[in-house]
Amino acid sequence: MQLLKDKFGRVHDYIRISVTDRCNLRCVYCMPEEGLTFLPHEKVLSKDEIVSFMELMVKFGIKKVRITGGEPLLRTDIVEIVRGLGAIPEIEDISITTNAMYLAKKAEALKDAGLTRVNISLDSLHADRFKAITRGGRLQKVLDGIQKAEEVGLFPIKLNVVLIKGQNDDEITDFLRFTKDKDINIRFIEYMPIGHAGTSWKEKYLPLDTIFEACNEAGYEYEPVDSIRGNGPSENFRIKGAKGTFGVIHPVSAHFCDSCNRLRLTADGYIKACLYWDEEMNIRPFIQDPVKLMQLVQKAIDNKPENHEMALKLQDEVQSNKPTWRRMSQIGG
């Protein structure tokens, strides 16, 4: 099998596929409150295009798929998309990232269609604050979605918490306490300068050392744990005696580019080899031409930078490549 390898020796076996740029929420770090123009439906990859693309990609070593958005559960055919991917025997793992507003209703059907596990965005455990950060989200719906995911066996369940200075950094110990009784992995993620002009994002940025400081202040003893299924770049720990775990993902202060194994496919059909760079290539004209399609994918991988230099934005230093100005919802979170 010819593997998708870049010039730095990184083998790519994982792809994140955005199935929509639309979302029912407007999280402060992801989307503006208003003024967004969404893709017309005919510009969004169809189920058949996604499945056809993946039937080819598995021949080159891709074996893990994460479905993203926008909010992927807004797709009326999301169960059929999962079922189509699940019918490809080479795919070992199908996961989804969701805000969980509709997860309680759809978890069982998704599990039956072949979904393996789920990542859920949850940035506050206080209903009013959660509503403010998401601009309209209902915390109870997320909690119901988590419970349903547990019931149907979507495991491991991971909760993504974007740490936002002045908004949820006083809830760190609450999230850590959440792991004591539930076999859940809570992942604290640095606030990233994706699609944000200027330096205003720095006002909300906190280094993830804050997590360990909170542990120490609360008297929580913690220890490293082995890799969690599908853990990617997360460094994982367990508070002694807890059922669940917590992890930290620091794309800004300590990037993990040297072990990056992923590609991204946007909802409108552009392949991106690096989240943070503008370069992207349109696959749609070549869906029915396997040779040209794989040449395009390999070209994207060949052009992948050694690292994204995102940390330079912390020091206002010049970057050698042009960062992306698509928002996360437009790329695929």
Curated annotation (Swiss-Prot):
It comes from Listeria monocytogenes serotype 4b (strain CLIP80459). Binds 2 [4Fe-4S] clusters. Binds 1 [4Fe-4S] cluster coordinated with 3 cysteines and an exchangeable S-adenosyl-L-methionine and 1 [4Fe-4S] cluster coordinated with 3 cysteines and the GTP-derived substrate. Keywords: 4Fe-4S, GTP-binding, Iron, Iron-sulfur, Lyase, Metal-binding, Molybdenum cofactor biosynthesis, Nucleotide-binding, S-adenosyl-L-methionine. InterPro entries: Aldolase_TIM, Elp3/MiaA/NifB-like_rSAM, MoaA, MoaA_NifB_PqqE_Fe-S-bd_CS, MoaA_twitch, MoCo_biosynth_MoaA/MoaC, rSAM. Pathway: Cofactor biosynthesis; molybdopterin biosynthesis. Catalyzes the cyclization of GTP to (8S)-3',8-cyclo-7,8-dihydroguanosine 5'-triphosphate. Its cofactor is [4Fe-4S] cluster. This is GTP 3',8-cyclase. It catalyses: GTP + AH2 + S-adenosyl-L-methionine = (8S)-3',8-cyclo-7,8-dihydroguanosine 5'-triphosphate + 5'-deoxyadenosine + L-methionine + A + H(+).
